Amino acid sequence: IGGFSRYMEHVGASSALFRVFEKPLKHIHNPYLLLGAAFIVEQIMVIFVPSHAGLGLLLMCTLYPILVRSGVSPLSALGVIGCCQFLDVGPGSGNANMAAQVAGMDVSEYFVYYQLPLFIALVVILTFVHMFVQAWWDKREGWKFDPKNVQTFAGTKPAVDVKEAPKIYAILPVIPLFLIIFFSKVA
C-alpha cells in the first residue's frame, strides 16, 4: 500500500481526486469542519479495514491531499489520520474476536452490544476535540494557508502537472478501498 500511495501522488492522482471534490468543498468555509467530517468518515472506515498500517496509508493517499488542499494544516491532517485506529473495533478486529471468544458470545453480538455504543460516544467527543484542539494549535503555531504552496505542504511534487492529470485518475486512489469493502463480509 505504501508504494501504491507514493505512486498515486507521483502521477497526480491525489490532485485529480481533490479537483473532483474541489467545488463542493468550496462551500465549507471552515477547514476544521471538514477535519471533523473527515474524522467521522475515517472512523466508519475503521470498522471495515482492521489493518492499522493499511488504513493509515490509504488515508494518506486519499484524505490527506484533500484536507491539506482545503486549508487544513499538514500537522492537523496527520493528527486526525494518526488517530484513525484509536480503538480496535469491528467484527474483523483480532481483539474483538478474542474478547468475544473469551466472553463466550458471537463476535457480531459483542460488536453491536458492547463495542458500538462506546465507539459512537467516543467518536462524537473526539470529533469536537480534534476540531477545537487542532484549530487552537494551528493558531498558536501561526499556521496560514497558502494555496500557491500546496505541494510544499503535501511534501511531494507530482511528476505530472497537477492541472494536466486527467480527472479519471481520481478513481485510482480509492480503488483499494472499494476492493477491501467489496471483498469483505459487508458486501
Predicted regions mapped to residue ranges:
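Short, amphipathic, aromatic/basic-enriched membrane-interface segments that mark the entry/exit
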Residues: 22-30, 83, 161-166
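Alpha-helical transmembrane segments and, especially, the helix-loop junctions at the ends
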Residues: 42-58, 64, 69-114, 118, ...
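Structural signal for the C-terminal ends of transmembrane alpha-helices
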Residues: 8-11, 71, 132-133, 183-184
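Hydrophobic, membrane-facing alpha-helical anchors
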Residues: 11-15, 32-34, 74-76, 139-154
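Membrane-embedded alpha-helical segments and adjacent helix-loop junctions characteristic
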Residues: 1-65
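Long, contiguous bundles of hydrophobic transmembrane helices that form the permeation core
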Residues: 112-187
